[in-house]
């Protein structure tokens, strides 16, 4: 298993706790993910869990396992239950001997892209630590990850490259924002194109 496996699990479970607090009327709220309301973000998060789980089991090359449209209705009907089931699926799939060396097919990164399991789980770790924050600030809920999770997250997240490709449609992250933060999680958020000060009020004023 990757060295950060326990911290990855903690981050995913933290995202489950945050999503469990989502109320139905909040699903139309805008999020820090430009162009996505909360229902769309949760649908994406649910689909990605199942996609990574399929990749861990050797089926990642099938584009259908990543398709978010499959979960639109389920998320609308039961966001917390649908999301928790997806999180359980991916954690079970990752809890396998030798998973860090196993090849993961990742068609979202390009045709025939295959990466080692440790790298794929690293991407997943970064995604869900940040998406948990996205959901929390969207609904105005408190959010904090344990120090050991942030310490494990920082080198993985800061290794994500920046560049013109982040301007492309479908890029997982916007361009990195300038940072003078001493808070490690805030540095991660800025490196991944998030403003740590984002709020619903901010979104309304700026149109973000």
What feature does the model see in each segment?
Residues 44-45:
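Glycine-rich loop at the start of a catalytic domain that most often binds anionic cofactors/ligands
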């Amino acid at each position: 298993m990757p060295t950060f496996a326990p911290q990855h699990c903690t981050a995913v479970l933290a995202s489950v706790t945050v999503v469990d607090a989502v109320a139905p009327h909040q699903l139309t709220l805008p999020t820090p993910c430009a162009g996505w309301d909360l229902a769309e973000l949760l649908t994406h998060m649910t689909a990605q869990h199942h996609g990574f789980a399929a990749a861990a089991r050797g089926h990642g090359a099938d584009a259908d396992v990543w398709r978010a449209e499959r979960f639109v209705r389920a998320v609308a009907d039961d966001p917390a239950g649908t999301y928790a089931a997806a999180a359980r699926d991916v954690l079970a799939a990752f809890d396998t001997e030798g998973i860090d060396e196993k090849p993961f097919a990742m068609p979202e990164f390009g045709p025939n892209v295959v990466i080692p399991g440790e790298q794929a789980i690293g991407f997943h770790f970064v995604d869900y630590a940040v998406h948990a924050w996205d959901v929390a600030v969207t609904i105005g809920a408190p959010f904090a990850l344990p120090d050991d999770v942030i310490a494990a997250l920082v080198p993985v997240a800061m290794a994500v490259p920046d560049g013109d490709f982040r301007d492309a449609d479908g890029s997982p992250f916007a361009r990195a924002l300038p940072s003078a933060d001493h808070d490690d999680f805030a540095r991660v958020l800025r490196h991944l194109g998030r403003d740590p000060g984002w709020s619903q009020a901010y979104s309304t004023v700026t149109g973000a």
